[in-house]
Amino acid sequence: MLHAEQITEFLISISTMLLVARVLAEVCTHFNQPSIIGEIFAGILLGPTVLGALSPDLFAYVFPSDSAVKTVLEGITTLAVVMLLLVIGLEVDLSLLLRHRKAAFYTSMIGTMFPFVLGFALAYHFPEMFGAGGNASLLVFALFVGTAMSISALPVIARTLMDMNMLKSQIGLIIIASAMFGDLLGWIIFSVILGMMGTGSPGNQLGTTILLLGGFVLVMLIPVRRLINRAIPFLQTKISYPGGILNFIFILGFLCAAFTEWLGVHAIFGAFIVGVAIGDSAHLSEKTKEILHQFVTNIFAPLFFVSIGLKVDFFANFS
């Protein structure tokens, strides 16, 4: 349990992140730029690159090294990105996405395989350049680097499209679907790599992961989607509004996010699929979507993107 001083430090950190993110997001919006640019830049300003270099004492006060406070902040930012992908999923037009599934798939394969092959080849032939340890398996290390280079920044892509009002467009959906397919492939490969590093059988692990993930997507987008479509009118009219429907969306989103995280695939994929399944319902009111959108994109999402900037230390990385 956090004591009084840790609670104070945590609240100061959150308040500072939200304040600077909002100010810089408004500046970017004024110049017709996506607000995410301001939010990430806010993290860079507040992080070790700027504030930490100019005023180490102030940086240590605003973002203390206390492990408990750090853990809580990491938990909040993880929750934030899960909620963001849930909201992104609500905006996806499933029928339009299915019509352009081939374009999304081929784009994803091209966009994933090129950086994977390049990263694998470089890491395999020049492992010292990537800091490979002497005891590391060269094949596993090269697979790891190739996979890391092939995974896109899905939350950043999604938020940028949302800020530019392109999320519901044809090109926006193809971009989102391509990034989603590519990242799914990347996380599945990561689960195989972890199996190769341990004592389990990578082949069995890969087959199980693909089977469970494929089953999850099919179940969520066919029978569960239909059940949700029938349940939403009841939730929006018979239970306290908007509390009832919001609780339902978040509970289902968090449970499915937990499931995909347990599979070894990132939690954001479970949340995104739930968002798609719920958002496809004709009964989900625009008011409900707007409440979710405003709540997540103005409170939680900025915390996640600021946290990205906070992890950047240009002086340390390029020294």
Where is each model-derived feature located?
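Short helical (or helix-break) motifs at transmembrane helix termini and adjacent helical loops
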Residues: 83, 91, 141, 145-189
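Transmembrane alpha-helical segments of multi-pass membrane transport proteins and ion-pumping complexes
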Residues: 14-26, 44, 48, 52-53, ...
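Membrane-interface junctions of multi-pass transporters
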Residues: 46-103, 233-241, 245-319
